[in-house]
């Protein structure tokens, strides 16, 4: 089977100044609050946000009735509403400029699994996802940074073949059940 072509464009951009204590503290707080693996995950969200804000700024410079502003602006807003970053009552380009990285971090699968109570902590949520215990709809998703759409949010649950979702029990549990069955048979004799 042929492999998919690689994209060589960067998905994140690092800060120009590496040691700013205020920024470092803010990043550490975000990484802890949302259970991120490294700073690159924060930089990736910031990069996405900067591209979205750049597009919004470009569209805001155009005339109100400009067809490009109307078409592309509505498409941008609709996309942000669909993933749940922008609320229905704030469907204007001005509100797009007010978006923060936290809005995008809230929509990650890892955060949603924790908020739904499927995991004991944000870190446990990441482990459950990478170990393929979580499904969105019928599709198992093992990427913690997966952006959950609003309509998919209600379909997040344990995978049907996961021990948590009523599937086959794990190795240790099966072993312990086997021991329990053998002890019961010996007592009967």
Curated annotation (Swiss-Prot):
The keyword Cytoplasm applies. Keywords: Cytoplasm, Ribonucleoprotein, Ribosomal protein, RNA-binding, rRNA-binding. GO terms for biological process: ribosomal small subunit biogenesis; translation. The keyword Ribosomal protein applies. Belongs to the universal ribosomal protein uS4 family. Component of the ribosome, a large ribonucleoprotein complex responsible for the synthesis of proteins in the cell. The small ribosomal subunit (SSU) binds messenger RNAs (mRNAs) and translates the encoded message by selecting cognate aminoacyl-transfer RNA (tRNA) molecules. The large subunit (LSU) contains the ribosomal catalytic site termed the peptidyl transferase center (PTC), which catalyzes the formation of peptide bonds, thereby polymerizing the amino acids delivered by tRNAs into a polypeptide chain. This is Small ribosomal subunit protein uS4. The gene is RPS9B.
